[in-house]
Amino acid sequence: MTQGYDTFLAATANDRRDAFVAAGRRLGAAEQNIEKDFWVCWTLDALFNGLPAGGPRLLFKGGTSLSKAFGLISRFSEDIDITVFRDDLGQGAHAADLEALSGKKRRARLDAIRAACQAYIAGTLTGQLIEI
């Protein structure tokens, strides 16, 4: 993970608040938005730089990715959109293969993919993030 986050988080609560207030004044934004943006960035750093190598790949997508990763838009984000590669969860399936299935079989296959993803997020990923 990026060392700057640890340094900032080691500061006192008052010093962190003062930093959010100062940044908010400089950027013309509410301090709450600055703090929320800090935690969005910390979470992205944790997900993409803090997890052990070899785990399921994650994909950062959506409007926040356009803002944070590519600088294409300027906004404060409410959430981040992350996808877990289903192949890495042992649930590989191409869209065409899923579409070829009957409705009942497709639902069952999608339910299995969803369950594998939920199990990874609630189990392994949550444990790794707690360790950070």
Each predicted region: which residue ranges?
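Compositionally biased terminal segments of proteins
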Residues: 1-132
